[in-house]
Amino acid sequence: MSFIRSALAAAAFVALSIGAVQTASAADPENTVILKLKDGDVALELRPDLAPKHVAQIKKLVREGAYNGVAFHRVIPGFMAQTGDVKFGNMDKGFDAARVGTGGSNYPDLPAEFSKEPFVRGTVGMARSQNPNSANSQFFIMFDDGPFLNGQYTVVGKVVSGMDAVDKIKKGSEAENGAVKNPDKIIKATIEADTK
């Protein structure tokens, strides 16, 4: 009987140790983006191991303040919330409701970095046109699993805290492909390492 208790205790210790290692590896401040939204902060763990070029571009844009004030212009209930059009989507300066969702940044589009990482609730993926090598600054956060996106879009990270704030982002009209009138926005985006 004591052997079983010892084995269970050892198994519990190993499970807790693995959990601690996973938590520690998910807490890399250099690859954590904090999005300040109206309903709270959202922490995104970026994955340079999956998409190094995309992650580098997102971090560059965050550090430039390019995402501050940018609308969640396309939000489809049960699917995803899309943002990141730094050219036409800035609600604080130059918002263009007719063109939002068609712009990117002043940097070149990126080659696809598809992976086997699945699109599940909280996954952060890069938006693009039909051309797989057209992602630039726009990204989306999954409300639910989307296996039909697997291997078709670049995964750049996942939400590690604040999914409740993501769930409260103003939804768009399904009849208009998720277009949002008077959309919510990213109030401010920062790299966690820069705030310490």
From Swiss-Prot:
<protein>
    <recommendedName>
        <fullName>Probable peptidyl-prolyl cis-trans isomerase</fullName>
        <ecNumber>5.2.1.8</ecNumber>
    </recommendedName>
</protein>
<keyword id="KW-0413">Isomerase</keyword>
<feature type="signal peptide">
    <location>
        <begin position="1"/>
        <end position="26"/>
    </location>
</feature>
<dbReference type="GO" id="GO:0003755">
    <property type="term" value="F:peptidyl-prolyl cis-trans isomerase activity"/>
</dbReference>
<dbReference type="InterPro" id="IPR029000">
    <property type="entry name" value="Cyclophilin-like_dom_sf"/>
</dbReference>
<dbReference type="InterPro" id="IPR024936">
    <property type="entry name" value="Cyclophilin-type_PPIase"/>
</dbReference>
<dbReference type="GO" id="GO:0006457">
    <property type="term" value="P:protein folding"/>
</dbReference>
<dbReference type="Pfam" id="PF00160">
    <property type="entry name" value="Pro_isomerase"/>
</dbReference>
<feature type="domain" description="PPIase cyclophilin-type">
    <location>
        <begin position="29"/>
        <end position="194"/>
    </location>
</feature>
<dbReference type="InterPro" id="IPR002130">
    <property type="entry name" value="Cyclophilin-type_PPIase_dom"/>
</dbReference>
<keyword id="KW-0574">Periplasm</keyword>
<keyword id="KW-0697">Rotamase</keyword>
<dbReference type="InterPro" id="IPR044666">
    <property type="entry name" value="Cyclophilin_A-like"/>
</dbReference>
<comment type="function">
    <text>PPIases accelerate the folding of proteins. It catalyzes the cis-trans isomerization of proline imidic peptide bonds in oligopeptides.</text>
</comment>
<dbReference type="InterPro" id="IPR020892">
    <property type="entry name" value="Cyclophilin-type_PPIase_CS"/>
</dbReference>
<dbReference type="GO" id="GO:0042597">
    <property type="term" value="C:periplasmic space"/>
</dbReference>
<comment type="similarity">
    <text>Belongs to the cyclophilin-type PPIase family.</text>
</comment>
<keyword id="KW-0732">Signal</keyword>
